């Protein structure tokens, strides 16, 4: 009997330890983020522009688990969501505008739980205010 209990605990640990759990006010989306739904994208922008970095999926929320960025000069960095090629329709701020200076950066989130939540079907874009290099990455899931 102890062997069976041990096997159940080992199986539960293996399953639950291989991804992240999310709790959300959106009951249909609360639960487990399987590793197969996790992805990442590079942030590599050198102009004052709005750049799509995550394409939304109809019927799926996007959970941003972490992002990091470092600036090569002074400029603002902001995450927004919306639809269209540059999130131009229904544009909504996910973050405030981070005012970065040369060689300054930031890290948000641990990568194992949602730091930011994007409603179903919306794209995620980066808005930069100056023609300076902004480099980093963003980790997300669309379960």
Where do the protein language model's features map onto the residues?
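Sec-dependent, cleavable N-terminal signal peptides
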Residues: 1-28
């Amino acid at each position: 009997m102890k062997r069976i209990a041990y096997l159940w605990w080992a199986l539960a640990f293996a399953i639950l330890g291989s991804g992240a759990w999310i709790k959300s006010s959106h009951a249909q989306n609360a639960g487990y983020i399987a590793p197969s739904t996790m992805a990442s994208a590079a942030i590599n922008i050198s102009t004052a522009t709005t750049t799509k970095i995550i394409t939304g999926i109809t019927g799926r929320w996007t959970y941003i688990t972490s992002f990091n960025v470092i600036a090569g000069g002074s400029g603002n960095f902001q995450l927004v969501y919306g639809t269209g090629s540059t999130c131009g329709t229904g544009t909504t701020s996910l973050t405030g505008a981070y005012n970065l200076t040369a060689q300054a950066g930031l890290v948000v989130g641990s990568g194992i739980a949602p730091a930011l939540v994007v409603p179903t079907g919306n794209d995620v874009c980066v808005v930069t205010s100056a023609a300076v290099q902004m480099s980093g990455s963003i980790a997300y899931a669309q379960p």
